[in-house]
Amino acid sequence: MDAFTAGLLQRIRTTETDLTRARDEGDDFLVEVEQAELDDLRRLAAEHGVEVGA
């Protein structure tokens, strides 16, 4: 696994964790921010052929 792939997957995992935390805390604004970031990261992964878990 190259550095780009490893870094991208790490950012996705971190964002998923942050999204869960925002949901648990009831922070609707932060949920929207984190969801948008996650969507962007998943799009980037797809564009580069990086497989991401569901």
What are these regions (language model features)?
Residues 1-54:
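C-terminal-biased regions
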